[in-house]
A protein has these predicted regions:
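Short conserved micro-motifs at the rims of enzyme active sites and ligand-binding pockets
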Residues: 41-45, 61-62, 69-70, 81
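Long, internal low-complexity/basic segments
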Residues: 81-133
């Protein structure tokens, strides 16, 4: 958007055309990673999620708990639909999308302290799932 070169190690999608003109393609899904409590490096709060225009699916590492929300009909995400048989097809779709994206990113879904030990040095990020910067 500022006509600056994009370094090769930058991850993500170029959505500048969509932002600037309102035209262009947008991703069908968004992938989200919660690496845990990285300020104090506490394990037990790690999660992954994927969402489309209507639904959000998330899973916690610690206990494997799954969440499925209908963002259009439940914008506060108060009703977990994961056990509702009406939504099983959507649940499976989003589980698979999340697994595919994690495979693509080499996301091993590890405890918070693993990221401290493998991706940082003196609190400076030195690597990501795709490797060193």
């Amino acid at each position: 958007m500022m006509d600056l070169p994009v370094p090769g190690e930058v991850e993500g999608l170029d959505m500048s055309e969509l932002v600037l003109t309102g035209e262009g393609s947008e991703p069908e899904y968004a992938f989200m990673q919660g690496m845990g409590h990285t300020y104090l490096w506490l394990d037990g709060y790690e999660w992954r999620a994927v969402r489309d225009k209507q639904y959000t699916y998330a899973r916690y590492l610690k206990d494997g708990k799954e969440l499925l929300f209908d963002n259009l009909n439940d914008p506060l995400q108060a009703v977990n639909l994961v056990d509702n048989t009406v939504y099983q097809e959507k649940l499976i779709e989003l589980r698979n999308k999340m697994a595919d994206k994690m495979d693509e990113l080499n996301d091993q879904f590890m405890p918070c302290t693993w990221y401290r030990d493998h991706w940082t040095e003196d609190r400076i990020i030195k690597a990501s799932a795709r490797g060193r910067f």
